[in-house]
Structure formats: structure tokens, C-alpha cells
Regions:
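Generic protein-terminus/edge-of-domain signal
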Residues: 1-57, 64
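A structure-centric signal for secondary-structure junctions around beta-strands
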Residues: 30-31, 75-77, 145
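Short, glycine/serine-rich, charged loops/turns that create anion-binding
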Residues: 41, 66, 85-87
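Short beta-strand His + acidic residue motifs that chelate non-heme Fe in jelly-roll/DSBH
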Residues: 43-45, 67-74
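A conserved hydrophobic position in a structured secondary element of the catalytic/binding core
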Residues: 61-62, 83
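Short, Lys/Arg-enriched, Trp-marked, Pro/Gly-tolerant hinge/linker segments that flank
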Residues: 113-118, 138-148, 159-192
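Hydrophobic alpha-helical core bundles mediating ligand binding, dimerization, or RNAP-core interactions
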Residues: 124, 128-132, 148, 152-160, ...
Length: 192
């Protein structure tokens, strides 16, 4: 049995858990949360959407979410990266708006058997290994704040590069949506 994870964090944290405490009731995460399933399977609900979450599956909520486990196998296990909103806002500045759009529309991804997808899976496991090395057990690193910012910015940029070009390029937006995206991009560019 694993300990319950705090719904918010002031620094990046890495955890491995079975999320069993999420079976009892929905749990609101106020921080960003990135999960990968390494064993077993479950159904995760956000109250609005349900996701089949099994081995080699990723789920990411950049600014938090309501999460509940609807059902899970006895061997269900995930690796989690939790990141505070303030670090996320600094890390995301150089990243374009289409990334937000894609992650908002597609927070769930199951890796397929093809070589590209399997390479991406191995790489995300490596990212989680680095997160474990740096951020497990609340290590007091000399340059922790800078390492958190660098790590989160790097993993977000890496994730952006894994987005299939066809999905990002073929999405048609209304004029109103395009103006909104351009406005948000201008805000991010000039907010520093």
C-alpha cells in the first residue's frame, strides 16, 4: 500500500504508486500531473472524460485536474511527476500555443507497437528515471529551483517534439479560436 499523494506541491516531485486512495472518491490535483502506467490497467475519470490507462500509456494534465480511479487491476502501478503551477508557468514561456491546444485536446496517449512509438516510450521512461534521480525523497539540491525549471522546460519541449505532425497540422480552427490563440501567445511573449 502506497501513501496518499498531496494534491498540490511547491516543488517538483516524483512518485511511484498504485493510486489506490483515488478509488474512494475524486481527488483534485491543483498542480500539474504527468502519469505513465508501468504495470496493470485501470480506468481513470476526470468527471468529464474516462481514460483506459494500461501499460505504456501516458496521461498529462498541465494545470491540474479532478481524478478518480473507477477500476484498477491488483497489479496497477504508475510513475508520476508532479509540478507546481509557478514552475510550469516559467517553463512554458518559450513554447508555442499549439502545444497547449494539443495537450488539452489529447491528454491521453497509448503507445503502439510501431518503432517510433516504442522509442518514444523508452524515452519517457528515461525522463522518469531522471525525475526519480533528481526529485524523489525531496532531495535538497544546491541548485534545486534552477534544476526544476530546466528539467520541466526540457521535458515539455521534448513532449512537444513527440506530437505527431499530422494531428497538429490538420486541425482546423475557427477565426475566433485563431484570434484567441494569437492573443494568448502575445500575452505569453510579453509577460516577462
Amino acid at each position: 500500500m502506497y501513501e496518499q499523494i498531496s494534491p498540490d506541491t511547491s516543488h517538483i516531485r516524483y512518485e511511484e504508486t498504485d493510486l489506490s486512495y483515488l478509488k474512494l472518491r475524486p481527488y483534485r490535483f491543483k498542480c500539474g500531473i504527468y502519469l505513465i502506467c508501468i504495470q496493470g490497467k485501470s480506468i481513470i475519470s476526470t468527471g468529464v472524460q474516462q481514460y483506459a490507462f494500461d501499460e505504456q500509456t501516458e496521461l498529462i494534465f498541465l494545470t491540474g485536474s479532478l481524478i478518480q480511479i473507477i477500476q484498477a487491476s491488483a497489479d496497477f502501478k504508475v510513475r508520476i511527476l508532479l509540478f507546481p503551477k509557478d514552475v510550469f508557468l516559467k517553463a512554458i514561456l518559450p513554447i508555442d500555443t499549439p502545444y497547449f491546444n494539443y495537450v488539452h485536446e489529447h491528454p491521453h496517449y497509448h503507445h503502439t507497437a510501431d518503432e517510433r512509438s516504442q522509442n518514444t516510450w523508452r524515452e519517457i521512461v528515461l525522463w522518469m528515471d531522471v525525475a526519480q534521480m533528481l526529485f524523489k525523497n525531496n532531495n535538497t539540491l544546491l541548485f534545486r529551483k534552477q534544476q526544476e525549471l530546466n528539467f520541466l522546460q526540457s521535458i515539455l519541449m521534448w513532449l512537444f517534439n513527440t506530437i505527431p505532425e499530422k494531428l497538429a497540422a490538420n486541425k482546423q480552427y475557427s477565426r475566433k479560436q485563431m484570434l484567441c490563440h494569437q492573443f494568448m501567445q502575445l500575452i505569453r511573449e510579453h509577460s516577462t
